Swiss-Prot record:
[4Fe-4S] cluster 2 binds at residues 83, 119, 122, 125. GO terms for molecular function: 4 iron, 4 sulfur cluster binding; iron ion binding; NADH:ubiquinone reductase (non-electrogenic) activity; quinone binding. Residues 64-93, 110-139 form the 4Fe-4S ferredoxin-type domain. GO terms for biological process: aerobic respiration. It comes from Cytophaga hutchinsonii (strain ATCC 33406 / DSM 1761 / CIP 103989 / NBRC 15051 / NCIMB 9469 / D465). It comes from the Bacteria. This is NADH-quinone oxidoreductase subunit I.
Length: 175
């Protein structure tokens, strides 16, 4: 049964002697191979040679401290709400008497976890934070053997005392 009345006539063209022995195809393939031989190699020897990161690269998270060493995070939860991967978990608590040197505001994050396996490193948490507490550094997230090691708590996230929180010049866009 014919569905259309269009038909195409196929002509069986006779191949020449050169086409039958595939010499032109072999020569053109060798020319392509030889042209790639003299181009710059894309592969680098990784441990010895490392490429520079892009200017806007986002790596490992840091919870920043202020000049007095107090945590900037006030557990407002905007970073967790803005995270499209739902990788951030926050539990808020009130600052107790005598903890003024540890936390900047009355409310602080008693639990702050980022699941690095879920995180897509989009930087929305950094942009949403009104206190500039969350910061994405240029540091790579190290490889681990267990999944639970990729859930970073405050022990891995809080900026160590006496270190700079701005190793790169990239600043997130804020209005």
């Amino acid at each position: 049964m014919q569905l259309t009345n269009r038909s195409k006539v196929v002509v069986d063209k006779k191949m020449t002697f050169m086409e039958r022995i595939y010499i032109p195809s072999i020569v053109s393939g060798m020319m392509i191979t030889l042209s790639h031989l003299f181009k710059k190699k894309a592969t680098i020897q990784y441990p010895e040679v490392q490429r520079e990161f892009a200017f806007v690269y986002r790596g490992k998270h840091i919870l920043k401290r202020d000049e007095q060493g107090r945590e900037n995070c006030t557990a407002c939860g905007l970073c967790a709400v803005s995270c499209p991967a739902e990788a951030i978990t926050i539990i808020a608590d009130e600052r107790k008497k005598g903890e003024e040197h540890l936390y900047k505001e009355e409310k602080y994050a008693s639990l702050y976890e980022i699941n690095m396996l879920r995180c897509i490193f989009c930087g929305l948490c950094e942009e949403a934070c009104p206190k500039d507490a969350v910061y994405l550094t240029e540091e790579l997230v190290p490889a681990q053997y267990n999944r639970k090691d990729f859930i970073y708590g405050k022990d891995k996230l809080v900026q160590p005392l006496g270190t700079s929180a701005h190793p790169k010049t990239y600043k997130p866009y804020k209005k």
